[in-house]
């Protein structure tokens, strides 16, 4: 089989009979590769858009989570504060109860002493009246 002198020189005709430097199958594969690359670039662009949207969503969720976390910390601190206030109030009331108990005991002792004095005075009055 005789070789084409143009093919030996590296020149080829395509399906439209245009003169090409590349072999037709190499040219076809190059075109296919170019199309695949364009598709790949388009898909990468779509992927980047999707990932960008996901990143924004995750950022928003992170902000919301941080806000809720701060609210929870604030509520916990408020609860601790209320608990401390109640404990302080409880201690104050316990001290007041102890003070009132002591006062009640003093009043009871004073009452008993006054009853004793009253009994003695009544006895003295009775003896004084009987002596007359």
UniProtKB/Swiss-Prot annotation:
One of its GO terms (biological process) is cell differentiation. Residues 74-123 form a coiled coil. It is found in: Golgi apparatus, cis-Golgi network; Cytoplasm, Cytoskeleton, Microtubule organizing center, Centrosome, Centriole; Cell projection, Cilium; Golgi apparatus. The keyword Coiled coil applies. Keywords: Cell projection, Cilium biogenesis/degradation, Coiled coil, Cytoplasm, Cytoplasmic vesicle, Cytoskeleton, Differentiation, Golgi apparatus, Spermatogenesis. One of its GO terms (cellular component) is intraciliary transport particle B. PANTHER family: INTRAFLAGELLAR TRANSPORT PROTEIN 20 HOMOLOG. This is Intraflagellar transport protein 20 homolog.
């Amino acid at each position: 089989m005789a070789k084409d002198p143009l093919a030996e020189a590296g020149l080829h005709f395509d399906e439209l009979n245009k003169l090409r430097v590349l072999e037709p199958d190499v040219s076809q594969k190059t075109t296919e590769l170019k199309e695949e690359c364009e598709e790949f670039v388009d898909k990468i662009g779509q992927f980047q858009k999707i990932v960008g949207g996901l990143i924004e969503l995750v950022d928003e969720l992170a902000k919301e989570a941080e806000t809720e976390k701060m609210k929870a910390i604030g509520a916990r601190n408020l609860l601790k504060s209320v608990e401390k206030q109640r404990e302080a109030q409880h201690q104050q009331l316990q001290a007041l109860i102890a003070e009132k108990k002591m006062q009640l005991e003093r009043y009871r002792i004073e009452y008993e002493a006054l009853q004793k004095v009253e009994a003695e005075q009544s006895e003295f009055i009775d003896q004084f009246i009987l002596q007359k």
